[in-house]
């Protein structure tokens, strides 16, 4: 059917209005992000203080498993496995934040540029597949970002043991100064922890730092044998 000039004009106008509305939505989305606290400039390095880090309180069963664990057993690092959560946030390697509409990406240059994908604005986790860094959703409580993480890979270590897949982490992240970041975490796992493990870390911003490439496998001199065990005896010296 042949359209009239008026019909074609109306169709073009509707298309232009729809495109303008979509562009306005995109612009509004980025304007919203621009109004959030500035986590994204530069990189963050932990202001590490081992004395401020409380030790987790383990269940009796977890204590027994830890005692029976071979002292020479290697950690995930010997086979270049990810540390998972909360391990990714522990070693003190520099991190960077990247916000986009509906998501936050946290990148660490610890090894192979580890990435956490945090979904912003979601109300629930749904039914996610297990992942080394888990499934994270977040919302803003004023100027504090509240992150909730579940579905962590059962092999991800927690207090020296495989977590078993029942770890739940709640984080509160906020700026305490122009170049200071506070990161409060509460880790729960009824199979390993006798009580929630709460700790706070502080980070300092380095505005001129950049993400660096790192590779665990490259240059690795402790490759596993046929059974997957490390060749080097990691038993602590007496």
Segments (PLM) and residue ranges:
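Hydrophobic small-molecule pocket/channel-lining residues, especially in calycin-type beta-barrels
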Residues: 21-238
């Amino acid at each position: 059917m042949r359209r009239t000039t008026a019909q074609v004009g109306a169709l073009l106008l509707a298309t232009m209005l729809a495109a303008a509305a979509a562009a306005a939505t995109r612009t509004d989305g980025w304007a919203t992000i621009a109004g959030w606290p500035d986590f994204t400039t530069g990189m963050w390095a932990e202001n590490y203080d081992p004395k401020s880090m409380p030790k987790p309180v383990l269940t009796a069963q977890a204590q027994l498993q830890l005692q029976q664990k071979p002292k020479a057993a290697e950690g995930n690092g010997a086979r270049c496995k990810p540390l998972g959560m909360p391990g990714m946030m522990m070693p003190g390697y520099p991190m960077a934040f990247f916000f986009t509409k509906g998501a936050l990406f946290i990148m660490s240059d610890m090894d192979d540029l580890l990435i956490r994908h945090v979904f912003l604005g979601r109300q629930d986790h749904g039914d996610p597949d297990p992942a080394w860094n888990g499934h994270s959703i977040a919302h803003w409580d004023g100027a504090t970002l509240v992150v909730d993480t579940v579905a962590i890979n059962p092999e991800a270590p927690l207090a020296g043991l495989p977590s078993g897949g029942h770890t739940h982490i709640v984080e509160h992240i906020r700026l305490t100064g122009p170049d200071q970041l506070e990161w409060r975490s509460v880790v729960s796992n009824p199979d390993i922890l006798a009580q929630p493990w709460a700790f706070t870390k502080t980070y300092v911003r380095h505005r001129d730092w950049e993400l660096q490439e790192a590779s665990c496998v490259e240059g690795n001199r402790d490759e596993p044998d046929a059974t997957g065990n490390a060749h080097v005896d990691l038993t602590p010296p007496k």
